[in-house]
Amino acid sequence: MENKQEILGQYFTKIEIVHQLLYLLFSYKKYDNKIKILEPSFGTGNFIKGLKGKNYLNIDGCEIDKNLTKNPCDFFEMPLTKKYDLLIGNPPFSKYNLKESYFSLTNYFKSAVWPSLYLTKKELKKDKEKIENIFILKSLKHIKDESSSIGYVLPISFFIKNKNKSVKDEILKYFSTIIIYQNDKIWFDRNIPCCFAIFANINKLKNKIIVIYENSIKNEEVFNIKNIHEELIPQVIFHKNNGYIKNDKGIPLEEFLENKNIKVKKSYRENNISASNILEKNKIPANKLVENYKLAVVRVGNASVGKCGLINIKDDILNDMFYIFDVKDQYKKNKQIKETICQQINQKIDYFRNITCRVGSKSIKKEDVYNFKVII
């Protein structure tokens, strides 16, 4: 099958990482060895091996890839009557530009386990949804009782601010404690930013979100569970709290920039402005109308995210890598303000590189630009 790994969302967690994640889980949640466990997409079986190494033997597993098991089975076909004390593993991840890697409702119209039994109303209205989200939703229906837990490796993008809101809201119906763990190691055979999320009910941590980033030292932050829709990426929080993302002086750009969509000329092939030359566009020529110049900030790309330039909306053609901003009415003819903002953004490109941690290329939100502070 072409692109089989990406279509099936297969990213197999290294065994040494599995041991670390199991240690973390059992340090927070105590279970005896007789509990019933499900690994819903066991892949190469590293989580099952790790559990058996700790003498947890009552384990069921699902794996859809017939090349990895003699008895392939689809987790979405598993009867909801099967209940577990612990669901753990590494669900598949959807690749954003690969339709086949997403969960499609049409594939399960004839299923004995009708998706309406585990999907939210919002997900039922969608043609496709990220498969990791559907794994979470169905897993919630397999927990045995309030003492049950889920521990899944997830793309770090799951915890981006205001993303996956319906899934997060559903999680809160079952669990009052969330632990999000990330470290500086590579967990798969490729570097995919990810985390280990534990959903549980732990009395001493009721209504708490524990965010952990480990880089030889374990750095921990605690939030109220009401913050579930905020940005909860451990590495980003660590960077903010330890000075790697320092931007605490000045005035937020939202005081200078309009919150409007700006139309510009775009072309993938026939453009004269791209991330490779945007830094050259830091001045407004003396013979040009200042009001025609807008701020262009690169929104995506590991090496380019955060670069800024001044583009002429009458003359320039851009590729699709930019957010475009215009200043408020009182600044539209102010050349100095525009050039100063551009200069100060470019002096702190690392700020934007460190504030983001996504699956694939680094990317920023418009909100990150509006919150950036400048001294004018």
Task: Please give the residue ranges for each predicted region.
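Conserved Class I SAM-dependent methyltransferase catalytic core
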Residues: 21, 120-183, 196-198
